Amino acid sequence: MRVSTRVLAVLLLPVAFLRAPGRARHLACQWALGLRYPAENLDGLDPRARRAFEEARTDAFWQDGQLIGLTSGHRDAAEQHRMFAEQVRRTGSWAAARRWVLPPEESSHVRGIAMDVRPTQGAYWLELHGGRYDLYRTYDNEWWHFEYRPETDGRPPLRMPHPGAEPYHSASRW
């Protein structure tokens, strides 16, 4: 599927060039990935986070032949609450649920800066190269979860064991 998506993007390049000469590779990549991952929705992402994600996956696609799709991006508070309530029901406790899903008031998805990506190879590429775009994996237990974090000045934020873990407070970073 990766090869056919790449071939499709190459075929779309002339049309993309006519539409946006300076951004043809970006546009052709987004079109091809949109066909490859038709259910993905980038709406609601913080505009800077969306731009960073699109730039990262365009570079991954053209430079390394790697596909990066979005499984979940922005969620409204009601959807996040539904997911959290379901996880509480499934795990039996609020604390156990927080290991996988946060309530809306704490969720980076609700703020529009979190992206759950696929496939695993795409997540691996993003883990290796995402810092160039201020995109970082933030939880040990979620290989797919990345956040747009420009405030870290190019340094990876401290990765937490899981979403509900208490942040480690220290005067210095390791």
For every predicted segment, state its role.
Residues 2-174:
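Cell-envelope/glycan interface and biosynthesis
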